[in-house]
Amino acid sequence: MSAIQASWPSGTECIAKYNFHGTAEQDLPFCKGDVLTIVAVTKDPNWYKAKNKVGREGIIPANYVQKREGVKAGTKLSLMPWFHGKITREQAERLLYPPETGLFLVRESTNYPGDYTLCVSCEGKVEHYRIMYHASKLSIDEEVYFENLMQLVEHYTTDADGLCTRLIKPKVMEGTVAAQDEFYRSGWALNMKELKLLQTIGKGEFGDVMLGDYRGNKVAVKCIKNDATAQAFLAEASVMTQLRHSNLVQLLGVIVEEKGGLYIVTEYMAKGSLVDYLRSRGRSVLGGDCLLKFSLDVCEAMEYLEGNNFVHRDLAARNVLVSEDNVAKVSDFGLTKEASSTQDTGKLPVKWTAPEALREKKFSTKSDVWSFGILLWEIYSFGRVPYPRIPLKDVVPRVEKGYKMDAPDGCPPAVYDVMKNCWHLDAATRPTFLQLREQLEHIRTHELHL
């Protein structure tokens, strides 16, 4: 560690670059890939006191570990940094200048819409190979077929197989970063050889969620095979690298396969989604203490997002998971963005989304607060669908006229007051998550929830 590097503060996460067996009793041995947490700086800047995942503490060498960083906001990650989209043949040739044998890019075909073109620099000139798209497969020679562009590029990187040269160096599209490189650089890349996929625990339109084993620990793995979908999920994974809180589902790492698969590995939440947990147990099992604790768990996660200028945009009981020891954690960061950005409202869940977000695409912490009020209603109704007996098309017009749902059966009046505060039509008059947490803690302290 050089003298100019600032020391890492307590709580910094590091990932081991090499094995360290330790030579003295106070050393903390570790294996390559282990995640360690800095406890304190020592007198010697080349060594830190750290602890491992089971809480054992000891001294570690700074040059054997790499600090884990969040992927920088605004970084445009790409699984296909060599893909340049709609550019012409002439533009491709300019991009591959000066000539360098094996330099390549892929573009959309101008002559054959729906097909692609592989452009390769070879001995001073550029060759253009049509990539035909037929029956959901891609091929250059109609002999070898590929599922996606990444598989095709990987194949011709290892073997020219009829091309003028094998593919050696990608011409990266300006402004993009290869996802694999960025996750590796920031300390979030995991090793596929150490991941065992055990069984499917959920299916989504994007792919499967599987129970896995990573280095002896149970993990949940989102497996995304389709390259376009995987590209969208990169945004979710990069948001998760920036967030750390005991009530947010924790990202453990990312695996990007050269063939196009993307695996997002997170902590395993044994008891599934909060909505299913509530529905399957009900009033006879879950008392007022338990419901208020879940409400506070979610509120603390949202207060953390609020403080870090992130808006979740899809807060609902289906997107909250429950751990083995009954801790509720917010998940599903697919729509989470920095507070300033806007988004298409095509797929938003109407019953959970604030009126101004549906009407004007205005998302803010205050629109998350509205959703939190709906989530509280879900908790206290034991997982009922909001706005019962109101047709979906009538929900927004009624809400915009000031309609608020009645309190769920048995809901304490103090908790119902909190819900109603979240549902002010004027976003500015809704409370912050900090204020909501204080209100819920007041309810707990004064036993107003029983």
From Swiss-Prot:
Its EC number is 2.7.10.2. Residues 9-70 form the SH3 domain. Its main location: cytoplasm. The modification Phosphoserine is found at S364. ATP binds at I201, G202, K203, G204, E205, F206, G207, D208, V209, K222. Residues 82-171 form the SH2 domain. Residues 9-70 are annotated as: Interaction with PTPN22. It is found in: Cytoplasm; Cell membrane. CDD domains: PTKc_Csk (cd05082), SH2_csk_like (cd09937), SH3_CSK (cd11769). Non-receptor tyrosine-protein kinase that plays an important role in the regulation of cell growth, differentiation, migration and immune response. Phosphorylates tyrosine residues located in the C-terminal tails of Src-family kinases (SFKs) including LCK, SRC, HCK, FYN, LYN, CSK or YES1. Upon tail phosphorylation, Src-family members engage in intramolecular interactions between the phosphotyrosine tail and the SH2 domain that result in an inactive conformation. This is Tyrosine-protein kinase CSK. The lineage of its organism: Eukaryota, Metazoa, Chordata, Craniata, Vertebrata.
